[in-house]
Amino acid sequence: MLQPKRTKFRKQMTGHNRGLAHRGSKVSFGEYALKATGRGRLTARQIESARRALTRHVKRGGKIWIRVFPDKPVTKKPLEVRMGKGKGGVEYWVAQIQPGKVLYEIEGVSEELAREAFALAAAKLPLATSFVKRTVM
């Protein structure tokens, strides 16, 4: 599972997920990419599940890049605990996703295979996504 090795603070405020992704919105490494068109949070488990779907479909061919990293801790209090007594412990890690963010990239495979692989990966994610190609300038 992806998570930071160490952080300055153990817990973070919830915050707001507003605006569009400007950083990480272009296809930088591979030929084809899966881009988020909706906003939300991706957990480390969801990122890993989609990565597995991608690698299993592509098999030995191609190289895959994961362009998102879960760096925000989400806390939760245990079940049947009364309110108060401070914030709960860190339960899992999430990556906040804005529309336009590139999630995964792939190269070394045909466009048809890339589309199929990204369709399988997108089914594992709670966001609306789209398939994009690298534009050559």
UniProtKB/Swiss-Prot annotation:
Alphabetical UniProt keywords: Ribonucleoprotein, Ribosomal protein, RNA-binding, rRNA-binding, tRNA-binding
Q: Which SUPFAM superfamilies match?
A: Ribosomal protein L16p/L10e (SSF54686)
Q: Which GO terms describe its biological process?
A: translation
| General function of this protein | Binds 23S rRNA and is also seen to make contacts with the A and possibly P site tRNAs.
Name the HAMAP family for this protein.
Answer: Ribosomal_uL16
Protein name, entry field: Large ribosomal subunit protein uL16
Subunit structure and binding partners: Part of the 50S ribosomal subunit.
Q: Write down the NCBIfam families for this protein, in alphabetical order.
A: rplP_bact
- Coiled-coil annotation: which residues? none
Q: Which GO terms describe its cellular component?
A: cytosolic large ribosomal subunit
A single Pfam family, by name? Ribosomal_L16
Which is one GO molecular function term here?
structural constituent of ribosome
Q: Which gene encodes it?
A: rplP
What the record says about family reads: Belongs to the universal ribosomal protein uL16 family.
Listed PANTHER family: 50S/60S RIBOSOMAL PROTEIN L16, LARGE RIBOSOMAL SUBUNIT PROTEIN UL16M
**Originating species:** Pseudomonas paraeruginosa (strain DSM 24068 / PA7)
**What broad taxonomic lineage does this protein's source fall under?**
Bacteria, Pseudomonadati, Pseudomonadota, Gammaproteobacteria, Pseudomonadales
What's the superkingdom here?
A: Bacteria
